[in-house]
Amino acid sequence: MPVIQQENGRRSVKGLPQSWGVRAYRELSAAQAGVIGPMPERYKTLAAMLDGLTDSEIPLDATDAQICMLAERWANDCASNAATIHDATTLRQRMEFICGVRGIEPPGEEDDQQVIRRCTDPAWWRRNLRKVFNRKFEHAAIRLGRVSGSAGAYVSNETVQKRISQNRRNRKALAAVTMENENGQRYQLDDLADKGMGNKKLRKGELMLRFAGCDAIAKERADVGLFVTLTCPSKFHAILSKSDTINPNYQGATPRDAQDHLTDVWARTRAQNDRDGIQPYGLRVVEPHHDGCAHWHMVMFMAPEHVEQFTKNLKRHALAVDGDEPGAHAHRVATEAIDPAKGSATGYLAKYLSKNFDDEHVGEHVDEDGTISKPKRVGREVVTPAQRVEAWAAVWGIRQFQFVGTPPVTPWRETRRIEADKIADAPDHVKAAWLACQRETTTDEHGEVVVTKPADYAVYIRAQGGVLQGRDYRIHVAERLKAVEGRYGLVDRHVPTGIYCASAPHVQYASTRYEWRRVGLAVGVGLRGPWSPVNNCTADDAPFWEAAAAYSAEVPPFDDSEWFGSFDFDCFDKFGDYNPDLFTQRE
C-alpha cells in the first residue's frame, strides 16, 4: 500500500514529487471516503498503480545527484567483478547480467574490452540511468494525469523545464570550447554546431527543400498526393480529450509503445502494398497528442489508380487491433487528397514542420482531437508548444521525420563538400548532382545575403535515378576504416571521405574535411624531483633525464563549484532557475 508522509503540514504519497504526491493522496482519500470495511475497487486500483510507480531503486523524486551516486555505486560493482573475473568473455556476460537486472540496456559493442570499459565507467551509467529515469518519470506523469491539455500538453512541466535547462547548459558548454583545424582556423564549438543539422533553422530548411523536390518529381510523374493521419487505438491514450479525465480503456502504454504500434501498422501496410504493386513515396511526421500518445501525419505520392487500394490496405491493418471500438472507423485513419487548387503539398506540410521546430506561422497548436495548445508559463518563463514537442521527442527517443522512397540524404550532404575541380572528369549525373547541391549567394548594398542560385533537390533525385530505386541509386558515400581514439580506447569506425558512382565504384571523388582538435586540452605533465636536504641538486648536476623533465604547474586549491555546475548536476534556486553560485565554497 502507498506510504503516506506529511511535510510542512501537507500529506502526500511518499516516493512521488510533492505536487504529484499531494494530488495522489487527495484521490486516495476521495476513493475511500466514508468506506467502512473492505476498500472499494477504485481505491485498490489506484493504490496498486501508486505502488508500481514508487517501488523502484530510483524513486521518482530522486535528484540528479542521487542518480550520479547510484551510477558510481553500480560502476564500482562492475569494477569489483573485474578484479576477480579475468576472462573477458565471462566478465562481459557478468556485466551484461548486472545491467539487465537494473533495467539498463547493455552496451552493444562487439569488442569485449569496449563493453567492460563502459560498464566500469560512472559516466556511462549516468547517461543510461538518466535516460531510464526520465522515461519512467514521464510515464508516471502520464499515468497520473500530469500530461494533458490543461495540466501541460505533450510532456509534464517538470520534464520540459529539465530539457530547457539541459539545452542551456549544453549551449554554455559548447561556447566554452574552442576547436582548431589543421589550417589554423579556430571556432567556438557552438558556432561549429550551428553550421550543421543541429541548427534547427538549417534542419527545417533542408526538410522543406527535400520535400519540395519530392513534390516537383511527383508533378513530373503525374502522381497525386494524399495527406494521411494515422492514430492509435483507445488503449494507448491516457487522457480523454473532451473531458480531460483518465481514459478507462488506458492500459499503461508509453509513447514509445504507441510509436512501435504505428511502425508495425506501417510495416504491414508496406508489405501489402509491395504485393499489390503499389509504391508510395513521401514524408511522415510523428507528433504527440495532448496526452503524449504518438500519431503520424504523412504526405504520400502515388499513381492516381493506386489511391483507393492504398487506403484500403492502410485501414485494414490500422483496424486490426480493436477495430470495432467506438470511433475507430471514423478516426483511426483519416485521408485527404491534396488539391493543387488549394496549394502545393509542400504548403500542406509546412505547418506540421513548423509545429515541431519554431511555431513560425502556425498560430495555435490544434491536435486532431481538437485540443488547443498555447504558450504556457512554467516557473518563471513561458514555454512554447514547439519546446514541449522537442522535449517529448527527446525524452522518448522518437524520430520525428522520415522520408519514404526517396534517395538518401547522406550523399547529398557529402556532395556539397566536394570542390568543383574534383568532379571535372565525373559522369554527367554526378556533375548534375553536384550542381543541384550547390547554393550560390551574394551580398547586396545593404549587407543582406541574397540567394542567386538555390539548391534543387528535384535535380538531385533525377541524378540519383529517380524515386523508389531502393539499393539501385547511382551515387553512394565513399568510406574508409579509421581507428578513432575515444573515451574507451581505439575504435574502428567508417569515416566518410567523399562519393563514388555505383557504375564505377573504384573511382572516388574526395570531399573536403578537416581534422579538429580542442585548443588547450592537452597539458604537459612531467616528473619533478623531490626538494629535500638529501637531494638538492642543481640543474647542471642533475641527470639528463631529470633536467629535461617539465616541471608541473602549481595546483590551485580544489573548487568543486565548476563540477557541480556541469552536466552532471542540476542546481536550482528557490525560483527553479539554474544557479551555480549555490555550490560556491565558503570559508
Predicted regions: what is each one?
Residues 1-292, 304-587:
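Right-hand nucleic-acid polymerase module
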Residues 299-303:
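Short hydrophobic/aromatic beta-strand micro-patches
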